[in-house]
């Protein structure tokens, strides 16, 4: 098979809707892209299935997402997770003893609280009889937490589950070198002074060099940013196009923030600091300013920069998921149904960031829907180049036929329906918490805009991906 990264643009549809739409006008200046036009709820079939429980999102919250190294820098992950859980309890008034199970996603684990779901639950005042576990699946960890909750409820094991995610990039674990760790363990086992002196005599200064957390893929030894740069080149996505998309994300996020649309954000009183009330990474700039930045990964000719990449972020999120009959019995008005979902994986070398392209047609087929049925799209924005590459791949018959074994492309999401309240580029991306943010953004947008179906999709390290259909709850 021809390598994706050596396949040139001449083999992609030069006159695709995306090429025309994206290259002919600045994304930041189109009124269509500033917000979706309000529409009446369309009359479509529901995705309810006979003899299968309807599962709903009652509500969801998140702490403000902050640039790492700012107001959350002195906290631990369980502090943020506890804040999200406490915010959810306050928002929903759900009795703690009604919650059957708690699941949190995270990526970079703090050893002291390796099961951060359990520690955060206890810290938030949940019963010690409420089980909790932590999952990890890179950037789709909280997606996995939510779908695990769906499975527990669908199988009848639970009626009420809290799912969420957390990431604290301000204090990542930094270990001693392997040689130093081995020496310290050997010293701990030594029984005599002579044995200890013998071990110490082997010490060398380079043992003190710290072992930093890996930023590259274990299987390929390539950083995600480097992969994004190669992917952008493979799909002939220019630096200007990437900067335009990033500016769009920040502009829409700022607009949504100013209009009070980011209602899932709950204030958090940081111990010893002021109360944090909003995301602090939203930074509408200008294309001229963004163009001044140097490439961040492939130098000097790469196109991925700090401006068109998501930034290191601290934050936590949580959603209350219930069986519909339980929610109604408790007097709740749910926000949305969680419907079909799909996980995919592909080549982590050349297709690391193409999870949405692979997952989208599969979840649509599973749900019996088409792209035209979707009213709201919420895709994770790891990099501008990643988003634009996915959009081009989704709009390419050649890619569908040669890489996905499909007869035709799935099609291009209309930009007027796409990430209209900003995305990970602007709001931030705490690895373990983004999935819940995506679902709540879709649910809240459906309610605001009068749509019925939302599609959530994300890529993840390891060449994995996720997509889910969210259906608006009837008003």
Curated annotation (Swiss-Prot):
The modification N6-acetyllysine is found at residues 73, 189, 294, 299, 333, 349, 362. It comes from the Eukaryota. Pfam families: Thiolase_C (PF02803), Thiolase_N (PF00108). It is found in: Mitochondrion; Mitochondrion inner membrane; Mitochondrion outer membrane; Endoplasmic reticulum. Keywords: Acetylation, Acyltransferase, Endoplasmic reticulum, Fatty acid metabolism, Lipid metabolism, Membrane, Mitochondrion, Mitochondrion inner membrane, Mitochondrion outer membrane, Transferase, Transit peptide. It is an enzyme of class 2 (transferase). It catalyses: an acyl-CoA + acetyl-CoA = a 3-oxoacyl-CoA + CoA; butanoyl-CoA + acetyl-CoA = 3-oxohexanoyl-CoA + CoA; hexanoyl-CoA + acetyl-CoA = 3-oxooctanoyl-CoA + CoA; octanoyl-CoA + acetyl-CoA = 3-oxodecanoyl-CoA + CoA. Pathway: Lipid metabolism; fatty acid beta-oxidation. Its EC number is 2.3.1.155, 2.3.1.16. InterPro entries: Thiolase (IPR002155), Thiolase-like (IPR016039), Thiolase_acyl_enz_int_AS (IPR020615), Thiolase_AS (IPR020610), Thiolase_C (IPR020617), Thiolase_CS (IPR020613), Thiolase_N (IPR020616). The modification N6-succinyllysine is found at residues 73, 189, 191, 292, 294, 333. GO terms for biological process: fatty acid beta-oxidation. The record marks 429 as: Increases nucleophilicity of active site Cys. Residues 174-221 dip into the membrane without crossing it. The keyword Mitochondrion applies. Transmembrane segments: none annotated. GO terms for cellular component: endoplasmic reticulum; mitochondrial fatty acid beta-oxidation multienzyme complex; mitochondrial inner membrane; mitochondrial outer membrane. The active site is at residues 139, 459. Mitochondrial trifunctional enzyme catalyzes the last three of the four reactions of the mitochondrial beta-oxidation pathway. The mitochondrial beta-oxidation pathway is the major energy-producing process in tissues and is performed through four consecutive reactions breaking down fatty acids into acetyl-CoA. Among the enzymes involved in this pathway, the trifunctional enzyme exhibits specificity for long-chain fatty acids. NCBIfam families: AcCoA-C-Actrans. Belongs to the thiolase-like superfamily. Thiolase family. This is Trifunctional enzyme subunit beta, mitochondrial. It comes from Bos taurus. The gene is HADHB.
